[in-house]
Every structure is written in C-alpha cells, then in structure tokens.
Curated annotation (Swiss-Prot):
Segments forming domain KH type-2: 39-114
InterPro entries: KH_dom, KH_dom-like_a/b, KH_dom_type_2, KH_sf_prok-type, Ribosomal_S3_C_sf, Ribosomal_uS3_bac-typ, Ribosomal_uS3_C, Ribosomal_uS3_CS
Encoding gene, per UniProt annotation: rpsC
Quaternary context: Part of the 30S ribosomal subunit. Forms a tight complex with proteins S10 and S14.
SMART domains assigned to the protein according to its UniProt record, in alphabetical order: KH
Protein name: Small ribosomal subunit protein uS3
Feature: compositional bias, Low complexity: 229-248
PANTHER family: 30S/40S RIBOSOMAL PROTEIN S3, SMALL RIBOSOMAL SUBUNIT PROTEIN US3C
Length: 267
C-alpha cells in the first residue's frame, strides 16, 4: 500500500496534520469547501513566485478565517511595511462569502520554511524551472538530489516522466539516494507532484524526501524539520573530521599522475 498511496495522505492523522481545520453542517459544508478552493486558487496565482509550500485554513468562528501560509520567501508575501499582506487580506475579504449578513474576517499568518531543500514541493518546483530552461533532465535531477542530501535528508527519490529531451516516445526515469521507507508510518516523508511546461509537452515530476522519524506520535512541523536537519548536519561533520584525523584511505593516483611520476623518477 505504501508504494501506491499518496505518502502525505497515508500519514494524515498519524504524524501529519490536516491542511483544512474546520467542521460544518450539511448545508454549510459545500459553500465552505468552495470558499476554500477560491482562497487557495487566488493565493497560488498571486504568490507563485513566493515559494509557497502549503496553505492551512482554520475556521474557529463562523465569521473568522485564519490562514497560515508556509513560504520560503516571507519577504515577498509580507512586502515593505506589510503592504502586500494587507492587500492580500483586503482582496480575500472580497472573495469569501458573508455569514448571515456579516462580513468574514480574514487573518493571515506567515510561517517561514527555513530548510527549502527539505521541502518536496519546492524541490520539485526547482526541477520544473530547470527543465523549462532546457536543462538536461538528468542534470536537473542529480543537482536536486545533491542539494537535498546536503540539507540533511536521510533519503530522496525523484522521478520525471514525459517526452524527455524531446523524444518521440514518452518514458520515465527516476533516481534514488539513501532510504525512503514508504511503508513506515512514523517516517516523515514529504511528497510532491509538480509539472514542467516545455515546448515538447508537459513533464510530470514526483519528489519523495525522507526527513527522519517522528517522535512520540507528534505532528511534524517546519521548525522541527529544520532543527533535526541541523543536528544531523553537525553530527556528519564531526564524523568526517574524526575519520580524517584517524587516517582514512587515501585515493589512488590517477594513471596520468602515476606515469608522470615515473618519468620524473627516471630522469
């Protein structure tokens, strides 16, 4: 099951929290859902350059909507002196419906993503941007994997499907580094599906990032991901330093270097 199902939906309620936190009666459910779709569509359209990962919508009262925007570029969303976020709030107030003649109040909270290279959606967007700039797909995928590993991930998998390099027959290729335990529910695996629009057609991009295990069944937060990655990075640096001091294996000289040394010795 873990190989087929969406990894995020598979872990909702276990280590992942919901993106929509509200409850409505039968008559109010459909209007509230349509309202959520309008809000998400507007924000995705107007914040496409702000590196937004996900948007959380919470309704604590019938006349209040709390939005939480997770972004790697909070300055673009907030703007100078908070002008842009105020403009978003006023525009969203016009989009949402009224409740019994009262206008709903929209509150916007901004959460910074401190480790964008550990976010599957942002990594997939970067691969899509590279493919749209005609970068070779293998180079784009390997570059993304290297960035994710340097950020402190335990495993990463990327897949690109479509007319790769303009081939007549569509195919898919994937690269995996480390481990990606899809069946383990406590494993914090971020997943994303993105799309690159090229002159040969659209390419699908799937990204899986294994960021570690959740502790005590708590929901994963962006702050926890950044802290865990920093701890793993410090541990890896200490390990590499000790291996150098103890004397690791030296690299074998290249053939060109060996022949040059031999000629020098004969002279």
């Amino acid at each position: 099951m873990g190989q087929k199902i969406n990894p995020i939906g598979f872990r909702v309620g276990v280590i992942r929290d919901w993106d929509a936190k509200w409850y409505a009666d039968k008559k109010e459910y459909v209007p509230a859902l349509q309202e959520d779709l309008r809000i998400r569509k507007y924000l995705e359209t107007n914040l496409k350059d702000a590196a937004v990962d996900r948007i959380t919508i919470e309704r604590t009262e019938p006349t209040r909507i709390n939005l939480t925007i997770h972004t790697a570029k909070p300055g673009i969303v907030i703007g100078r002196g908070g002008a842009d976020v105020e403009r978003l709030r006023s525009e969203l107030s016009k989009i949402v419906d009224t409740y019994k003649g009262q206008h709903k109040r929209v509150n916007i909270n901004i959460v910074e993503i401190r480790k964008p290279d550990l976010n599957a959606h942002l990594v997939g967007q970067q691969i899509a941007a590279d493919l749209e700039r005609r970068v070779a797909f293998r180079r784009a995928m390997r570059g993304a994997i290297q960035r994710v590993q340097r950020a402190g991930a335990k495993g990463v998998r990327t897949m690109v499907s479509g007319r790769l390099n303009g081939a007549d027959i569509a195919r898919k290729e994937q690269y995996t580094e480390g481990t990606v335990p899809l069946h383990t529910l406590r494993a914090d695996i971020d997943y994303s599906w993105d799309e690159a629009m090229t002159s040969y057609g659209n390419l699908g991009i799937k990204t899986w990032i294994y960021r570690g295990d959740a502790e005590n069944g708590q929901f994963i937060k962006d702050e926890d991901v950044a802290a865990a990655a920093n701890n793993r990075g410090r541990g890896n640096n200490r390990g590499r330093g000790n291996s150098r001091q103890n004397g690791g294996r030296s690299r074998r000289p290249r053939q060109g270097q060996a022949s040059t040394q031999g000629r020098g010795g004969n002279n």
